[in-house]
């Protein structure tokens, strides 16, 4: 295994911290993410793909079943990913009864920024040095000309749908969203507030 291969594997081999709590039945160990889930905190980190999306959807449904009145906090640090996987998270956020508060730490790009903006109104936040990026959907397809035409129509349909939803959540006119997503548009935390993607920049807990 080369050094570069080891570096690529390193994040996946990292140990997840464990938390030990004292209960009436003795000690109980949790991995850190399971312990934070008890506090209704979910992490959306890395590429948005089907497996990760299924886990996040399952966590949101579990927290809704546990308490349908209490907010869920979704922390986002993602470069984006697969549209259909992201839309499964989006639809669940809109479907469940609890408000989903979104917090960007690090970056929320592409599908990450879409999910950031999709949080409950008044409960969408960026940390001070986070970055947000919006753009149009990416796609590529090889095959017969007719199949390429079919896929081109599909991605244009998805683009129009996502622009409509982004306009709804940001309050920007659809024409502005169409123009600004034509190419990568990067924003600071304060820029994201002014654009309507989030409601405030959090510097410290109240």
UniProtKB/Swiss-Prot annotation:
Its EC number is 3.4.21.92. Keywords: Cytoplasm, Hydrolase, Protease, Serine protease. It comes from the Bacteria. GO terms for molecular function: ATP-dependent peptidase activity; ATPase binding; serine-type endopeptidase activity. The active site is at residues 110, 135. InterPro entries: ClpP (IPR001907), ClpP/crotonase-like_dom_sf (IPR029045), ClpP/TepA (IPR023562), ClpP_His_AS (IPR033135), ClpP_Ser_AS (IPR018215). The keyword Ligase does not apply. It is an enzyme of class 3 (hydrolase). One of its GO terms (cellular component) is cytoplasm. Pfam families: CLP_protease. GO terms for biological process: protein quality control for misfolded or incompletely synthesized proteins. It catalyses: Hydrolysis of proteins to small peptides in the presence of ATP and magnesium. alpha-casein is the usual test substrate. In the absence of ATP, only oligopeptides shorter than five residues are hydrolyzed (such as succinyl-Leu-Tyr-|-NHMec, and Leu-Tyr-Leu-|-Tyr-Trp, in which cleavage of the -Tyr-|-Leu- and -Tyr-|-Trp bonds also occurs). It is found in: Cytoplasm. Gene3D superfamilies: 2-enoyl-CoA Hydratase, Chain A, domain 1. PROSITE patterns: CLP_PROTEASE_HIS (PS00382), CLP_PROTEASE_SER (PS00381). Cleaves peptides in various proteins in a process that requires ATP hydrolysis. Has a chymotrypsin-like activity. Plays a major role in the degradation of misfolded proteins. Belongs to the peptidase S14 family. Fourteen ClpP subunits assemble into 2 heptameric rings which stack back to back to give a disk-like structure with a central cavity, resembling the structure of eukaryotic proteasomes. This is ATP-dependent Clp protease proteolytic subunit. It comes from Edwardsiella ictaluri (strain 93-146). The lineage of its organism: Bacteria, Pseudomonadati, Pseudomonadota, Gammaproteobacteria, Enterobacterales.
């Amino acid at each position: 295994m080369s050094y570069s291969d080891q570096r690529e594997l390193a994040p996946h081999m990292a140990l997840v911290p464990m938390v030990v709590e004292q209960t009436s039945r003795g000690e109980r160990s949790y991995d850190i993410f399971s312990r934070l889930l008890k506090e209704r905190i979910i992490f959306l980190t890395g590429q948005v793909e089907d497996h990760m999306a299924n886990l996040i959807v399952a966590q949101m449904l579990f927290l809704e079943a546990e308490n349908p009145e209490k907010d869920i906090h979704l922390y986002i640090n993602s470069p984006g990913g697969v549209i259909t996987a992201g839309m499964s998270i989006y639809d669940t956020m809109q479907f469940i009864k609890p408000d989903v508060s979104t917090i960007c730490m690090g970056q929320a790009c592409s599908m990450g920024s879409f999910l950031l903006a999709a949080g409950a109104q008044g409960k969408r936040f960026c940390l001070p040095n986070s970055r947000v990026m919006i753009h149009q959907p990416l796609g590529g397809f090889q095959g017969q000309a007719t199949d390429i035409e079919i896929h081109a129509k599909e991605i244009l349909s998805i683009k129009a749908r996502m622009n409509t939803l982004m306009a709804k959540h940001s309050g920007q006119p659809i024409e502005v969203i169409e123009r600004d997503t034509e190419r990568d548009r990067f924003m600071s935390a304060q820029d994201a507030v002014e654009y309507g993607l989030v409601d405030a920049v959090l510097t410290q807990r109240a």
